[in-house]
């Protein structure tokens, strides 16, 4: 059984999708040890409680430095014998302490066809760009923002009559298929 921790900052829909894949047996030999969140009021906490997943709430402002924050996370991760970190809407850059402890063992999903539209509001950037396709990317995490080695991408059309909300739904649907598929192939 491979132990993973999932990091999320917001609603946690990708977190819950992964948990449901584990619970249903579609993601085999994986144990979700805990949800790690950096916001005490994030909706992902409710999703974790619904699935009886332990939650660690650690807000960086509670620590003297980013290094102290990440060292605390590493202590918790090591206590739970976590082997992989899965970022699912975690809105912070991973720093050197976490990267050193989990080198090559941190995955992220991003709602664009990287290297296009890194950072926040990638779907909005694609929508307003005039592009005719966008998609989702799973990549390894490095010290940059959405710059790690790309593992796999899936794409969808941006139709002229799509609203931004419709495009967000299309990309979310891709993410719900892509992330568990990549996790099944990579996390062993």
From Swiss-Prot:
Organism taxonomic ancestry: Bacteria, Bacillati, Bacillota, Bacilli, Bacillales
List of residues binding N(1)-(5-phospho-beta-D-ribosyl)glycinamide: 12-14
Uppermost EC category: transferase
Recorded superkingdom: Bacteria
UniProt record, GO biological process: 'de novo' IMP biosynthetic process
Gene Ontology MF terms in the entry: phosphoribosylglycinamide formyltransferase activity
Protein name, as recorded: Phosphoribosylglycinamide formyltransferase
Reactions the enzyme catalyzes: N(1)-(5-phospho-beta-D-ribosyl)glycinamide + (6R)-10-formyltetrahydrofolate = N(2)-formyl-N(1)-(5-phospho-beta-D-ribosyl)glycinamide + (6S)-5,6,7,8-tetrahydrofolate + H(+)
InterPro entries per the UniProt record, alphabetical: Formyl_transf_N (IPR002376), Formyl_transf_N_sf (IPR036477), GART (IPR004607)
């Amino acid at each position: 059984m491979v132990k993973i921790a999932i990091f999320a900052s917001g609603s946690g829909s990708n977190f819950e999708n992964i948990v449901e894949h584990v619970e249903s047996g579609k993601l085999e030999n994986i144990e979700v040890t805990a949800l790690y969140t950096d916001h005490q009021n994030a909706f992902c906490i409710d999703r974790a409680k619904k699935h009886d997943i332990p939650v660690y709430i650690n807000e960086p402002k509670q620590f003297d430095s980013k290094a102290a924050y990440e060292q605390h996370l590493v202590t918790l991760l090591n206590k739970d014998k976590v082997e992989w970190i899965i970022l699912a809407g975690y809105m912070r850059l991973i720093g050197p302490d976490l990267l050193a402890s989990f080198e090559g063992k941190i995955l992220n999903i991003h709602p664009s066809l990287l290297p296009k539209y890194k950072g926040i509001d990638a779907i909005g950037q694609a929508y307003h760009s005039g592009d005719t396709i966008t998609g989702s990317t799973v990549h390894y995490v490095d010290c940059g923002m959405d710059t790690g080695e790309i593992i796999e991408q899936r794409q969808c059309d941006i139709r002229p009559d799509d609203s931004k909300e419709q495009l967000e739904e299309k990309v979310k649907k891709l993410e719900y298929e892509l992330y568990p598929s990549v996790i099944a192939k990579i996390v062993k």
